[in-house]
């Protein structure tokens, strides 16, 4: 018996076959969808260089609305040229970067440089109440030894930005990236390197580890020291002057993880001098550089042993050249404030999730 108005339809197999095949196909699609939805999504890697460089090619962000990002103070109160992030960081939608504090109520995010708010944090931070959904980004390129009153900032910030690899927004002082094509830089000119070792140091603290090491080194090795308390060297002439040296003492002012500064990336590498480093461990340096791109003081039992090694390299052309082999495939790049702000812009676009950093101090120190 069938409902009124309905009649039983007889269907031979060759008439029903197309319908059965269609149902089977739909069932297969449905179960494939269920299987895919239950699988863990594979992470989509952000393009970085082989040695941890900031991204130069990122996922398209053109669909994102431009964010208004307020720079609360200039770093060290020194204005810098701001760039269009879509040009400086390909794949990033342009943020409305501003230093006009009157736009604070409308800003999607506020970038706060530590140095300018470290003396009286509660009075120098942006005012309360904070606009709903606004994110604050704490940033600093100084080491913990030079960041005061970090505990006073606990609970205020949503993101961190620094040279530390575990920052929410990682911005190293420098990085290596593959050549976009064949290397275009001229070959190393050994004949121009008529001097042995240079060191530029502005803050001369006699109790610091780097000065103590230098005092043990200098009886065994001639080191030309430049800086405020030694031979003056204008910044505009630094690269030209340092390019005359085979080695450069890239000694950091304090020893902290990932704290590898312009002393290596600019002073040494831009001058084609082999960096002799004193800072974090060799293992830490090798997370940024190939093992044969630098000489670490911890590889030697004493400053005297280091001096003897450098003097031997000075006379061994082939061994000295081995410290430049990495340049055949990689080139050094350097940090800039404009690039840092655009990295923040990119991160804020990619990560809309709201979070709070409970304690800057416990993380950074």
From Swiss-Prot:
Its main location: Golgi. Glycans are attached at residues 100, 158, 189. One of its GO terms (biological process) is regulation of cell migration. The keyword Phosphoprotein does not apply. PANTHER family: 4-GALACTOSYL-N-ACETYLGLUCOSAMINIDE 3-ALPHA-L-FUCOSYLTRANSFERASE FUT5, ALPHA- 1,3 -FUCOSYLTRANSFERASE. The chain crosses the membrane at residues 16-34. The gene is FUT3. Residues 35-365 are lumenal. Belongs to the glycosyltransferase 10 family. Pathway: Protein modification; protein glycosylation. It holds the Pfam family Glyco_transf_10. GO terms for cellular component: Golgi cisterna membrane. Glycosylated. It is found in: Golgi apparatus, Golgi stack membrane. Catalyzes the transfer of L-fucose, from a guanosine diphosphate-beta-L-fucose, to both the subterminal N-acetyl glucosamine (GlcNAc) of type 1 chain (beta-D-Gal-(1->3)-beta-D-GlcNAc) glycolipids and oligosaccharides via an alpha(1,4) linkage, and the subterminal glucose (Glc) or GlcNAc of type 2 chain (beta-D-Gal-(1->4)-beta-D-GlcNAc) oligosaccharides via an alpha(1,3) linkage, independently of the presence of terminal alpha-L-fucosyl-(1,2) moieties on the terminal galactose of these acceptors and participates in the blood groups Lewis determination and expression of Lewis a (Le(a)), lewis b (Le(b)), Lewis x/SSEA-1 (Le(x)) and lewis y (Le(y)) antigens. It is an enzyme of class 2 (transferase). It catalyses: a beta-D-galactosyl-(1->3)-N-acetyl-beta-D-glucosaminyl derivative + GDP-beta-L-fucose = a beta-D-galactosyl-(1->3)-[alpha-L-fucosyl-(1->4)]-N-acetyl-beta-D-glucosaminyl derivative + GDP + H(+); an N-acetyl-alpha-neuraminyl-(2->3)-beta-D-galactosyl-(1->4)-N-acetyl-beta-D-glucosaminyl derivative + GDP-beta-L-fucose = an alpha-Neu5Ac-(2->3)-beta-D-Gal-(1->4)-[alpha-L-Fuc-(1->3)]-beta-D-GlcNAc derivative + GDP + H(+); a beta-D-galactosyl-(1->4)-N-acetyl-beta-D-glucosaminyl derivative + GDP-beta-L-fucose = a beta-D-galactosyl-(1->4)-[alpha-L-fucosyl-(1->3)]-N-acetyl-beta-D-glucosaminyl derivative + GDP + H(+); an alpha-Neu5Ac-(2->3)-beta-D-Gal-(1->4)-beta-D-GlcNAc-(1->3)-beta-D-Gal-(1->4)-[alpha-L-Fuc-(1->3)]-beta-D-GlcNAc derivative + GDP-beta-L-fucose = an alpha-Neu5Ac-(2->3)-beta-D-Gal-(1->4)-[alpha-L-Fuc-(1->3)]-beta-D-GlcNAc-(1->3)-beta-D-Gal-(1->4)-[alpha-L-Fuc-(1->3)]-beta-D-GlcNAc derivative + GDP + H(+). It comes from Bos taurus (Bovine). Keywords: Glycoprotein, Glycosyltransferase, Golgi apparatus, Lipid metabolism, Membrane, Signal-anchor, Transferase, Transmembrane, Transmembrane helix. Residues 1-15 are cytoplasmic. The keyword Isomerase does not apply. One of its GO terms (molecular function) is alpha-(1->3)-fucosyltransferase activity. Its EC number is 2.4.1.65, 2.4.1.152, 2.4.1.-. This is 3-galactosyl-N-acetylglucosaminide 4-alpha-L-fucosyltransferase FUT3. Liver, kidney, lung and brain. It is a single-pass type II membrane protein. InterPro entries: Glyco_tran_10_C, Glyco_tran_10_N, Glyco_trans_10, GT10-like_C_sf.
